[in-house]
Amino acid sequence: MPPIVIYTKSSCPYCHSAKDLLRQKGAAFEEISVDGDRAAQAAMAAKAGGRSTVPQIFIGAEHVGGCDDLYDLDGAGRLDALLAA
């Protein structure tokens, strides 16, 4: 399974949903909280092509996007393959 990194904020319901889906899939992930951390937010945005909303999810070298993007991948049947790569 490729490394998974998810940038989050503690009060973000979409972050919790994305983490729940990854847990349901049995995927271990590194969570990076950007709560009040401008340097972490800037690093996330730079890595995510300027997107500054959370969550931002990376599977291996691929930027998946946010929570809706993760669920769209799952709904299309492509998330399991990405997690197994």
PLM features: residue spans?
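Short, glycine/charged-enriched secondary-structure capping and boundary segments
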Residues: D20-L22, A45, Y71-L73
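Structural micro-motif
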Residues: G49-F58, D68
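Thioredoxin-like thiol-disulfide oxidoreductase module
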Residues: V34-S52, R78-A85
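Non-catalytic, surface beta->alpha helical segment in thiol-disulfide oxidoreductase systems
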Residues: I59-A85
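Local sequence-structure signature of Cys/Sec-based thiol-disulfide redox active-site neighborhoods
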Residues: M1-E30
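Structural signal for short hydrophobic segments within the conserved structured cores
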Residues: E30-I32, E62
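Loop/helix-junction capping segments adjacent to catalytic residues or to phosphate/diphosphate-binding pockets
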Residues: C15, R38, L73
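Conserved short-loop catalytic and cofactor-binding motifs
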Residues: S10, I32, A45, C67
